[in-house]
Amino acid sequence: MELNVLLLLLCLSGGQVGAVEETLMDTRTATAELGWTANPSSGWEEVSGYDENLNTIRTYQVCNVFGPKQNNWLLTTFIPRRGAHRVYVEMRFTVRDCSSLPNVPGSCKETFNLYYYETDSNIENKISTFWNESPYLKVDTIAADESFSQVDFGGRLMKVNTEVRSFGPLTRSGFYLAFQDYGACMSLLSVRVFFKEMPSVVQNLLVFPETMTGAESTSLVIARGTCIPNAEEVDVPIKLYCNGDGEWMVPIGKCTCKAGYEPENHVVCKACPAAMFKANQGMGICAQCPANSRSTSEASPICICRNGYYRADFDTPEAPCTSVPSGPRNVISIVNETAITLEWHPPRETGGRDDVDYNIVCKKCRADRRACSRCDDNVDFVPRQLGLTDTRVFISNLWAHTPYTFETQAVNGVTNKSPFPPQHVSVNITTNQAAPSSVPIMHQVKATMKSITLSWPQQEQPNGIILDYEIRYYEKDHHEFNSSLARSQTNTARRTGGRVWMFMSVQVRARTVAGYGKFSSKCGFQTLTAEDYKSELREQLPLTGSAAAGVVFIVSLVAISIVCSRKRTYSKEAVYSDKLQHYSTGRGSPGMKIYIDPFTYEDPNEAVREFAKEIDVSFVKIEEVIGAGEFGEVYKGRLKLPSKREISVAIKTLKAGYSEKQRRDFLSEASIMGQFDHPNIIRLEGVVTKSRPVMIITEFMENGALDSFLRQNDGQFTVIQLVGMLRGIAAGMKYLSEMNYVHRDLAARNILVNSNLVCKVSDFGLSRYLQDDTSDPTYTSSLGGKIPVRWTAQEAIAYRKFTSASDVWSYGIVMWEVMSYGERPYWTMSNQDVINAIEQDYRLPPPMDCPAALHQLMLDCWQKDRNSRPRLAEIVNTLRPMIRNPASLKTVATIPAVPSQPLLDRSIPDISAFTSVDDWLSAIKMGQYRDNFLSSGFTSLQLVAQMTSEDLLRIGITLAGHQKKILNSIQSMRVQITQSPTSIA
């Protein structure tokens, strides 16, 4: 089966295949009477004759040249069209020269007319109504290139004329041909009716089916192609255009061989043999399996690792399989009281990898070492416990006089693939005596006007018998060098001799035979005020009175703490209450989500936490650089969240050495995007802020920015496809407008396109307030960037008045960019020239072949009065019926000859500067077509100004980009001729 397919593809791909002519009728093959109908009967006559090769043929002849007002009709039989949209008629005939006929009146002719009548049924019952011109459609008047005379006739010199005419479009089941003679002496030797069909073709791993030509000579019929077996699509959908002359144009789209297959002669994808592989789809060839791997079957996309060898998750299929490392060597331990330093040499075998790291396993053991358990979390490892790249680690905060076991593991990228534990080396140590750990907390037991009583719990690691405690006191705002010291044999202390309402800071530390531990953290306490004098008197009363006073004091402390707590809570609530009140004044509908500016938060990080999801950096894989932004590079990568499938993402990074303001500005875009949820708005996946570099992660758009995507595919989309893109952009902007969000930088470069041609609004970097007091003539924004003058409304440039109406103006410019396939608005004009022209009511002209309805919508968006511009919801409602009714887009806009209306293309030179067609073509860099113009008769600029796209095709200019450039110049030429009717060449 595969061999048969291969042979078929090889046959189809051989050489350039031209159109096939499928015959519908051919009188040369007739062996009996043709049976055509003639009227009157004295006109056309069917006879048997001979062609120039003396083959017997059935012909029709007529020669009533001596009678006046001849009107002889000849009607063929019904001809089925067999699905053809356009048919061709090849007529072979001879005509007698009227001047060679003696005494012939002036009614003698040397031409005849060809007509056709399209029908679904036979017309024999109403044949009488067909002997005049009214029911027919005229194809052409046929004239002979050569005629014969009496001398020629006597010498049997046949001067046969061959003419081919075509007509269409055809929609009925079939048609009749009619020949009208009105005074000629001629013979219709043969008539062949045929249509053109493109045969199947294989090009560059693409297969295109048989395709009929279009109904018009300029028609381009799309043939949808498929990939050959074991190939897959790349880029845009596959198609090939068949022109009206039956020629295949350049194919669009691409197929490449699947993983496991390689191309052969560009017509088949052949499976990789055993012991070879191909990992990715593409035009690459199969390769030998990498080291320590093998493939046992054909068409392998990857080679399987041999036993004991593995590939890491991040290894490519082209990478060799590797193994785990051996254990570290020569481990040395240095114990210092309750800390230890471990050092070692790298393993002898790295497993063939260069990503060897080290892990430390800490175990605390009993004195006899018969049982060990994992160390507590408070043990410190410097620089860290896992993923060490150096061969040294410092471990502290261990228990004193305690046996420990430390395992030093060597790991690499495939250790987690092995079923066995990592190779390691163990060392056993016992810590020495050490000073006690610090006191964790202090409590105030009692306070008077001049004294404070304190207590504290025993520390977690006394590391021996506590001999005593040292307490350090100093007043608030005094340096600790001005402190006073006291000692206590217990875990309580009383400070006396203070002042009324004195605030003091207190620290305490314990002492063992190993010395003092560290001082505790500072704790603040204070004596009572004069108003609490009664409390001091109660201290001198019996025990009952003292107890009562203590109860009162404790209650007051609880009350104060409650009041303070409520005050803090109220303060926090008040901040959010103000914020909610501020944002509830928007114009959104009830229940509609309203945009919140992240710059209104006192702490911008709070906005990031509220609107953006934090993503662990281990879930992110960076693959390649795809661009650079204001804050750093942009990458393509992969995101694999738990319990979710892996997806492609775009990753914006914050470059090193950033300031806090740059970090805030960078993350503000995530705070903005995180508030949006719409199919035409770029989706935020999350942010990475807890590691470096800081990242913003969004969905990945395969086709990139809209402007460059359109330029790369110039002329490749239908008007309906372009309007569909515009409707998607408008829907996204409508959503933003309903959230009371103003974009401020809407342009085709800030629209991203995915593989399904869905357009999504992106780049929210300029969408924050501009400085109101700036007087910089370059219109510097608060970001330090420039206002995009070519896309910005008049009031936004002049007064910094950014609204949804100014976004509508920008949307009109985006429409112009889309319909012009990514041309630069206002071409090479300077920003100041653009501003001046707009103020004088100049507007952009319609792009080539732009529907009038779309250009009118652009002009509506560019109304000087912002209140007169359509709302984004109205724009969506305007575009929707255009897609449903493509007929509304057939009327193409033209440039009016009124200077106050659309702006002229300033990049095209003045027509008066040219003296010839040659000069003009050289000026627009199209001099290679000089001979095409001159040989076709377009020898003056006056004639060139009348040319159409059909004329360009006819003279051999087939490249869409060149047609567009020449037609733009011709369009400008017409306007300049109309406005300044001077004499031109």
Curated annotation (Swiss-Prot):
Residue ranges, Extracellular side: 20-542
Location in the cell: Cell membrane; Early endosome membrane; Cell projection, Dendrite
Stretches in topological domain Cytoplasmic: 564-985
Ranges for domain Protein kinase: 620-883
Any one GO biological process: dendritic spine morphogenesis
Membrane topology: Single-pass type I membrane protein
Glycosylation sites: N336, N428, N482
Main enzyme class: transferase
Superkingdom of this protein's organism: Eukaryota
Residues making up the signal peptide according to the UniProt record: 1-19
Position of sequence motif PDZ-binding: 983-985
Chief place where the protein resides: membrane
Chain ranges of the Eph LBD domain: 21-203
InterPro entries for this protein: Eph_TM, EphB1_rcpt_lig-bd, EphB1_SAM, Ephrin_rcpt_lig-bd_dom, Ephrin_rcpt_TKs, FN3_dom, FN3_sf, Galactose-bd-like_sf
Catalytic reaction(s) noted: L-tyrosyl-[protein] + ATP = O-phospho-L-tyrosyl-[protein] + ADP + H(+)
Keywords, ordered alphabetically: ATP-binding, Cell adhesion, Cell membrane, Cell projection, Endosome, Glycoprotein, Kinase, Membrane, Neurogenesis, Nucleotide-binding, Phosphoprotein, Receptor, Repeat, Signal, Transferase, Transmembrane, Transmembrane helix, Tyrosine-protein kinase
Residue ranges of every copy of the SAM domain listed in the record: 912-976
Family: Belongs to the protein kinase superfamily. Tyr protein kinase family. Ephrin receptor subfamily.
Protein function: Receptor tyrosine kinase which binds promiscuously transmembrane ephrin-B family ligands residing on adjacent cells, leading to contact-dependent bidirectional signaling into neighboring cells. The signaling pathway downstream of the receptor is referred to as forward signaling while the signaling pathway downstream of the ephrin ligand is referred to as reverse signaling. May play a role in axon guidance during nervous system development. May also play an important redundant role with other ephrin-B receptors in development and maturation of dendritic spines and synapse formation.
Subunit details: Heterotetramer upon binding of the ligand. The heterotetramer is composed of an ephrin dimer and a receptor dimer. Oligomerization is probably required to induce biological responses.
Protein name: Ephrin type-B receptor 1-A
